[in-house]
């Protein structure tokens, strides 16, 4: 076929020509990511190699089943890729078994519950209102509809998970599954204590490490793998990979977990996403990755310290638990004139993206909230060091402390300067099809 024919063939036209509306929106999103500071704790920036793997011809391939046992022909190359992803996941986390097919963290969690419990069985996880996740028993989620739920919470004085209270709740409720994990909790969990409690009441222990998996991979957070029967995770938060899920487990659960993922929860796996997972997991084993995770935690601690400064305290701002061990900080605005929505909007005006978040015992509605969840993974990926994190922490602290009286133009100029000092995706236009 000649070049002239290619020019009129929709198979060969670039996105900018075939669908300028979508291309323009993608370009706009690229500009947003470059020009603002991303501080949503569950977001990150994937490397060029991960973008390339996910945007590859693997998107064309159906591969129901598992390597060596597919229901389609032509799976020789995708078998290699899935085996690489599984082996890398097991090696990275020192796990006996890995399933890398879940399309998302929620899909992984659904498969875990299908494996460990029957509909109507009782599960026990951290309350959503106290920092848990939708899939740990929220009543509108499948986990709250299919299973009986007995949640545990945090201590009202310390805002920490009290293991004595967890034990009392477990003895009282006798759950089939105990869940350790969170989406908004700034401290380490005691996995050994959870294991002891699970053994005492005859429950299986499932740890959801979606948020802190990257810290575990870097050796900067206690690993749940030696203690849990099953561990699930996303790949796109601190791990910095594609939006997807993985499951790790003791070998005893392998067959049932595989069956719960396929055909239990999903049909064909997304092989382009699995390739991107494999690449992200390889990167997660490098010294560069570990150094980035160290900066992630350092940045969060710098932010927590700034939000406990005198001007923040005078404005009624507090930091949940007084600090952080991980990649996020929870700003407590219950005593502030601003609610979570107003604080989120204020930071958005100066070019910092965060998300409002309920705090334990929150008096405000869920769509308003009395808190902010602020994370550092994306900025650490961007290259931020202690000096840069100190600057962005001061921008946030000043904005929240001064509220409506803050000089937003000046704060926005400081954000722009940081974004320019730490450029993102340089040359991206040259190596994508946009």
Swiss-Prot record:
The record marks 236 as: Plays an important role in substrate specificity. SUPFAM superfamilies: PLP-dependent transferases. It is an enzyme of class 2 (transferase). Its EC number is 2.1.2.1. Pfam families: SHMT. The keyword Iron-sulfur does not apply. Belongs to the SHMT family. Homodimer. HAMAP family: SHMT. NCBIfam families: PRK00011.1. Catalyzes the reversible interconversion of serine and glycine with tetrahydrofolate (THF) serving as the one-carbon carrier. This reaction serves as the major source of one-carbon groups required for the biosynthesis of purines, thymidylate, methionine, and other important biomolecules. Also exhibits THF-independent aldolase activity toward beta-hydroxyamino acids, producing glycine and aldehydes, via a retro-aldol mechanism. This is Serine hydroxymethyltransferase. It comes from Corynebacterium efficiens (strain DSM 44549 / YS-314 / AJ 12310 / JCM 11189 / NBRC 100395). The gene is glyA.
């Amino acid at each position: 076929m000649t070049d002239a024919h290619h020019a009129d063939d929709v198979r060969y036209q670039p996105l900018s020509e075939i669908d300028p509306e979508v291309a323009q929106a993608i370009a706009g999103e690229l500009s947003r990511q470059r020009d603002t500071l991303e501080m949503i704790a569950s977001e990150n920036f994937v490397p060029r190699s991960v973008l390339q793997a996910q945007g590859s011809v693997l998107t064309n391939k159906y591969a129901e089943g598992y390597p060596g046992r597919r229901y389609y022909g032509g799976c020789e190359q995708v078998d290699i890729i899935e085996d690489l992803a599984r082996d890398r996941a097991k090696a990275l986390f020192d796990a006996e078994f890995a399933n890398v097919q879940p399309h998302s963290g929620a899909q992984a969690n659904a498969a875990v519950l299908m494996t460990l419990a029957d509909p109507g069985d009782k599960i026990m996880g951290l309350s959503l209102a106290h920092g848990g996740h939708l899939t740990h028993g929220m009543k509108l989620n499948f986990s709250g509809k299919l299973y009986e739920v007995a949640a545990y919470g945090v201590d009202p004085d310390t805002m920490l998970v009290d293991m004595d209270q967890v034990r009392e709740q477990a003895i009282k409720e006798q759950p089939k599954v105990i869940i350790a994990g969170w989406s908004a909790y700034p401290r380490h969990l005691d996995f050994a204590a959870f294991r002891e409690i699970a053994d005492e009441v005859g429950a299986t222990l499932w740890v959801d490490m979606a948020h802190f998996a990257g810290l575990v991979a870097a050796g900067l957070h206690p690993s749940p793998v030696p203690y849990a029967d099953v561990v699930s995770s996303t790949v796109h938060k601190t791990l910095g990979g594609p939006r997807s899920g993985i499951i790790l487990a003791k070998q005893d659960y392998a067959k049932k977990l595989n069956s719960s993922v396929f055909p239990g929860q999903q049909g064909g796996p997304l092989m382009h996403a699995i390739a991107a997972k494999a690449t992200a997991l390889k990167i997660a084993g490098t010294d560069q990755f570990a150094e980035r995770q160290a900066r992630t935690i350092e940045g969060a601690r710098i932010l927590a310290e700034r939000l406990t400064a005198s001007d923040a305290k005078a404005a009624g701002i507090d930091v949940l638990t007084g600090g952080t061990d991980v990649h996020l900080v929870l700003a407590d605005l219950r005593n502030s004139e601003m609610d979570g929505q107003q604080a989120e909007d204020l930071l958005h005006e100066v070019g910092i993206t965060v998300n409002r978040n309920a705090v334990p015992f929150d008096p405000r509605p869920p769509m308003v909230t009395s808190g902010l969840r602020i994370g550092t993974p994306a900025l650490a990926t961007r290259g931020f060091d202690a000096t840069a994190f100190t600057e962005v922490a001061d921008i946030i602290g000043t904005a929240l402390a001064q509220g409506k009286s803050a000089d937003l133009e000046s704060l926005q100029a400081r954000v722009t300067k940081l974004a320019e000092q730490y450029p993102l995706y340089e040359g991206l236009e040259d190596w994508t099809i946009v």
